[in-house]
Amino acid sequence: LAGPLGCFIVWRRLAYFGDTLSHSALLGVAIALLLELNITFTVFIISVIVAMLLLLLQRQAQLSSDALLGLLAHATLAVGLVVLAFMTWVRVDLMGFLFGDILAINRTDIVIIWIGGLAVLAALALIWKSLFAATVNYEIAVAEGLKPDRANFFFMVLMAAVIAISMKIVGVLLITALLIIPAATARRFAISPEMMAIVASMIGAASVWIGLEGSLRWDTPAGPSIVVAALLGFIISLLPVQWLFKRLNFNRPMRG
């Protein structure tokens, strides 16, 4: 699920944008607990609002994009923490929200993750052509009538959805890492954008499985364990694999 979206984050250099949306998730958690709303739905709505607010400020404010991203990222995180601190009547597992807690996931969460994940993948498949065209060249996408602005809007909505449904597994502070690292790893092996998205999905799924297995075995936080697994995959991808294969074939004794 995170793989294809992560590819667009890497291609568009939107890592800090992903951080901003993921940090705003904690504000969504605080509002959900305060108003007794569904956490996943509230986080999704708050993430979309923050994304729209960012677009509005970029058009009207005097600050640069980096400054706006930093302002919104840390402001929403700080406000969320302050609101949670005042809610003394609610028992909040702050570490679970920040770094993920596999034990906090119930059957309803699993259903939401599956349905939400399939919906995100289906929506991404529908806007893939226009979104990729807008990534390569915005003007050409407009000239060809691919409606890149609409694709960009839905991309932000899909980002918010991924953050909302994966927050309990990875945690709000590490969601962006799960989006970026598998995509960065897949980039070294893929020969086409579609192949990169598929490989990134496979690497992301493997990282989640290995990370959760390690978390259960060694009693480590789920989110950091998943990110460490993804990081190990990226480090392995940096090794001169082709050179090693050639070396092994060269050292193999000749037959006959």
Tell me the role of every PLM-derived stretch:
Residues A122-F155:
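Membrane-helix/interface signature in polytopic inner-membrane proteins
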Residues C7-V90, A186-I198, S215-W218, V241-W243:
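Short loop segments and helix-boundary regions at transmembrane helix junctions
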Residues T220-G256:
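Cytosolic-side transmembrane-helix boundaries in multi-pass membrane proteins
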Residues S24-L34, L72-L84, A104, P148-A160, ...:
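Small-residue-rich segments of transmembrane alpha-helices in multi-pass membrane proteins
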Residues I169, I175-P224:
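Transmembrane alpha-helical segments in multi-pass inner-membrane proteins
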